[in-house]
Amino acid sequence: MAGSDPGSRGSSPQPPHSDWGRLEAAFLSGWRNFWQSVGKERAAPRASAEEVDEEASSLTRLPIDVQLYILSFLSPHDLCQLGSTSRYWNETVRDPILWRYFLLRDLPSWSSVDWKSLPDLEILKKPISEVTNGAFFDYMAVYKMCCPHTRRSSKSSRPMYGAVTSFLHSLIIQNEPRFAMFGPGLEELNTSLVLSLMSSEELCPTAGLPQRQIDGIGSGVSFQLNNQHKFNILILYSTTRKERDRAREEHTSAVNKMFSVQNEGDDQQGSRYSVIPQIQKVCEVVDGFIYVANAEAHKRHEWQDEFSRIMAMTDPAFGSSGRPMLVLSCISQANVKRMPCFYLAHELRLNHLNHPWMVQDTEAETLTGFLNGIQWILEEVESKHAR
């Protein structure tokens, strides 16, 4: 709840080696700074004479720090509603410290982020005085840009002709969209995402058609979403089943045989990779990519290597440019603590990609979040074809 002491939250602190734990500590510090800042003397917006008369016994008579403290218990939606009631409240509810607090509080709990809504991490890590440099910084606009509810509302307000065009185009597509699925989350989790997909009644999995096989890879698995949208997933593992199982049992990383090293890197740069010929054939024919990331909070990552492999797979030299990529921020089960999807997006440097992407929180056991992600990438493919 807004206004609760962040230090009293139920989640236990992460061990010092956790990637997410370090930033989480910075976020909690940001929360504490908010409560300290509202206790300082601040200038309240000047209310008009009419507003003073109308609200003489209301919140406007309270000190501004008390007003902000009370406002922090409202939801962002309620704040926006309050701001529409008068000029005084329209200015007051835009307070940057208040909206920075909402960002710090809500951002880790949001289940998806995309290439249009990823916030700049620096504006959250730095003290507010360094971000604003004495000027007004619109944290309210940043919050609205990132908020999943706002994104859904914007999406639902698209012109109807766009949906009709996309639907008509889908009628003449001969083959269902094909996606290459890869990433450490396919192999490192205690619960197999692939086994959950294969047993899903909502997705109706069937074996791929033999005539559409790719040498050394297979034909993938065809699925049907909502009994109407068909798509095909080519599941790409880094190595053999035996080697993957051994690596998972020993908590080590198996040698990834999908890629060959072009240049050895160091701790800062990482290595550069290229895909092997069989994988290149996959990249040439797919309509998009599904990257399964291990989002369990205790996991240590080689972020630079993961980014380099994503870049190698999505190289536009192997297919059309602008193909979308869905990143499944995956954990085994609901009781496993996860790193927030926005943090994972930053660490994977997804803002450096030149094509649409979305990160979606997913649970391997229940497939929670998976259908939302698939629906997004199917819409992106249809939109691309319609253009």
UniProtKB/Swiss-Prot annotation:
Pathway(s) where this gene product acts: Protein modification; protein ubiquitination
Post-translational modification Phosphoserine, affected residues: S11, S12, S48
UniProt domain F-box: residue ranges: 56-102
Post-translational modification summary for this protein: Phosphorylation at Ser-11 varies during the cell cycle. It is low in resting cells and high in the S phase and the G2/M phase of the cell cycle. Phosphorylation is decreased during late G1 phase. Phosphorylation at Ser-11 promotes homodimerization and is necessary for optimal ubiquitin ligase activity towards CCND1.
Location relative to the cell: Cytoplasm
SMART domains assigned: FBOX
GO CC term (a single one): cytoplasm
Keywords, alphabetical: Cytoplasm, Phosphoprotein, Ubl conjugation pathway
Pfam families: F-box-like (PF12937)
Any one GO BP annotation for this protein: positive regulation of protein ubiquitination
InterPro entries associated with the record: F-box-like_dom_sf, F-box_dom, FBXO4, P-loop_NTPase
This protein's record includes keyword Ribonucleoprotein: no
Subunit relationships: Homodimer. Part of the SCF (SKP1-CUL1-F-box) E3 ubiquitin-protein ligase complex SCF(FBXO4) formed of CUL1, SKP1, RBX1 and FBXO4. Interacts with TERF1; this interaction is prevented in the presence of GNL3L. Identified in a complex with CRYAB and CCND1.
Summary of the function given for this chain in its UniProt record: Substrate recognition component of a SCF (SKP1-CUL1-F-box protein) E3 ubiquitin-protein ligase complex that mediates the ubiquitination and subsequent proteasomal degradation of target proteins. Promotes ubiquitination of cyclin-D1 (CCND1) and its subsequent proteasomal degradation. However, it does not act as a major regulator of CCND1 stability during the G1/S transition. Recognizes TERF1 and promotes its ubiquitination together with UBE2D1. Promotes ubiquitination of FXR1 following phosphorylation of FXR1 by GSK3B, leading to FXR1 degradation by the proteasome.
Official protein name in the record: F-box only protein 4
Organism: Bos taurus (Bovine)
